[in-house]
Every structure is written in C-alpha cells, then in structure tokens.
C-alpha cells in the first residue's frame, strides 16, 4: 500500500487536503485509487460552489464503479483541476500531486485541523483489513 504524505490531512472517506497558505488543495488517496481501479471520468463542481464538510461534491468513475466524492472541509471552490477532464488517468498516476481535484478557500481552519493526520489515517486503513 502506498505511503500517505504527512504534509496533508485525511478523511475516512479517503479524501486528502493539503494546506497551501490560506487555501486547501483536495484529492483522493492512493487507497481510494487502488479500490477504484482505472479512473475513466471525474465530475467536479463549478467554480465558486460552496461546499459543506462531509457533503457530496462530485463523482469519480472507474472501470469498476462510480463513487461519490465528499468535501473534507466546508469552503468555496476556487479552482478545479481541468486536466482531469481530458486525462482522468492522472488520478491513478499521481493521486497526491497531478491528480488533485479542487482548490478550496476553507470556511474554518479548525475543520482542517480536525481531519486525520497521516499516521491516524494509516491506523484507520489497518482497521479496515481486520
């Protein structure tokens, strides 16, 4: 299983968020990608959409399934990764870098702080295999 970068926080729905100044970059984890298989489509929200922590914000389709994407924190969508429209496989190739999905302006920094750190996420994944 892939390592989980410790410069970001994680959710139990397998999304990650990385702080970039006063913004957060969001994507899905390597574990999620592993479960999905080859990604064929990523459906993301419009710019300036307001998201609520834990709420559905888009969908990701793969050869195996269609899965919902959930916001790790509340905030406003400032940017989406338009590269994923043309090349959804970027999510498979690089879930933590080129496969990012959203850039958010978070409503509250405390929501980010409440997410799982890399070691807590790794422990959560270990609990899934038992």
Residue ranges and their predicted role:
Residues 1-56, 93-130:
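Acidic, low-complexity mobile loops and tails
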Residues 19-22, 80-86:
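Short, conserved beta-turn/loop elements at beta-strand boundaries and strand-helix junctions
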Residues 33-34, 74-77, 82-84:
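Short, charged/polar surface micro-motifs in flexible loops or helix N-caps
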Residues 54, 60-61, 80:
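Residue-level recognition of conserved beta-strand edge/terminus positions
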Residues 61-70, 87-89:
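Short, Lys/Arg- and Gly-enriched loop/turn segments at beta-strand edges
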Residues 62, 82, 106:
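Short, conserved catalytic or interaction motifs in soluble domains
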Residues 71-74, 118:
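ATP/adenylate-binding site constellation spanning eukaryotic-like Ser/Thr protein kinases
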């Amino acid at each position: 299983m892939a390592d989980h970068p410790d410069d970001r926080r994680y959710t139990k729905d397998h999304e990650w968020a990385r702080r970039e100044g006063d913004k957060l970059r969001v994507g899905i984890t390597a574990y999620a990608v592993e479960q999905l298989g080859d990604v064929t489509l990523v459906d993301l929200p419009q710019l300036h959409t307001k998201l609520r922590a834990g709420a559905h914000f888009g969908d990701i389709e793969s050869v195996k399934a269609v899965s919902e994407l959930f916001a790790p924190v509340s905030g406003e969508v400032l940017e989406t990764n338009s590269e994923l429209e043309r090349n959804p496989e970027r999510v498979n190739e690089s879930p933590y870098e080129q496969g990012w999905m959203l850039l958010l302006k978070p409503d509250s920094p405390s929501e980010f702080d409440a997410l799982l750190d890399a070691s807590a996420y790794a422990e959560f994944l270990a609990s899934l295999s038992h």
